Amino acid sequence: MNMNTTYTDQIYEPGTLPPLGCIPRRMHAWTIRQDRLGDPLTAFRDEIVELPALKPHEVLVANVSVGINYNGIWAARGAPKNVLDANGTYGDDRQSFHICGSEASGIVYATGEAVSNVRVGDPVILSASKYDPDCPWIRSGGLPEYSPTYHMWGYEGNWGAFAQFSKVSDYQCVLKPSELDWDEAAVCCATGTTVNRMLCHWDGNRIRKGDVVLIWGGAGGLGTSAIQQTRAYGGIPIAVVSGTERGAYCKSMGAAGYIDRTRFTHWGSIAGLDEAGMRRWSMQAARFRNEIYEIAGGRINPAIVLEHPGGDTLATSLFVCAPGGMVVLCGATTGYLATVDLRHLWIY
């Protein structure tokens, strides 16, 4: 911890913070435990827990605004991975509880003795990426995401954003630009950077001016960021949503138009469909594609499809994607097992 730091037994109510230099010994946290895994509405509970001790390169941040991601649902359900089983395997002491939350903005309240990039009082954005900076792969210039040490803070790693204070590594802290408010800043590093990587990382399929980009879940966190970033790059964002109210919201964020997926019935696995069933599926998928054409103003297939529903939608994404285009995935919220008709890659 830091010089001139005092500690208090007072527990501060959510929404209030102690003065800088004063650190409570305990805090409110929204936790999950092994015996509550299942329905996220009952798996998460408000508990009073002790604040964690800091190691030399760690930072204690008071959270001002936090984002919600689907990995919190996975953690609460205990599937596809039981994060409580892995609690304590990423350099932290094992705890009987787990604090989720993978994006936040806040204020630095304490630093380990080796921290030099931030200091007490700094407003910061927290990145969810956790890894060992001394990993040979990373030290040789490899992307941290491909390191065997890589994991997600607030999902695999404990002490996430769903608490009054979070413990993070120093490299996770980015100074908050004054142009961003706390809420905008909170969603920059998990949602915002994920979208940017999907649009800009892959050689040969980086977004270009005039590209149609199909965005599943357009009214969600990833979707709203994708709409705005696609517009900023000169692309044409088309959102897929579940209802006209969400569609109107997407248009207010800059979408060229939206497709209401509740008007279609071909979602789910195509495995086992007979010839007649496949014909019906193809007719629905073609009708879905025609709505893209109507919004785009011509027979323009998406150059990029931002996929995260997975099991129910991947076959449609491949069906509508432009030749030479890219379907890029960052999740599987409707199911991990997906089926595709490979003929759509080279025949149709």
Predicted regions and their residues:
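Hydrophobic/small residue at the entry helix of a nucleotide-binding pocket
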Residues: 194, 221-222, 312-313
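NAD(P)H cofactor-binding loop motif with strongest signal on the N-terminal glycine-rich segment
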Residues: 217-218, 309
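NAD(P)H dinucleotide-binding glycine-rich loop of Rossmann-like/cofactor-binding domains
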Residues: 91-95, 102, 130-217, 264-269, ...
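Adenosine-nucleotide cofactor-binding segment
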Residues: 232-312
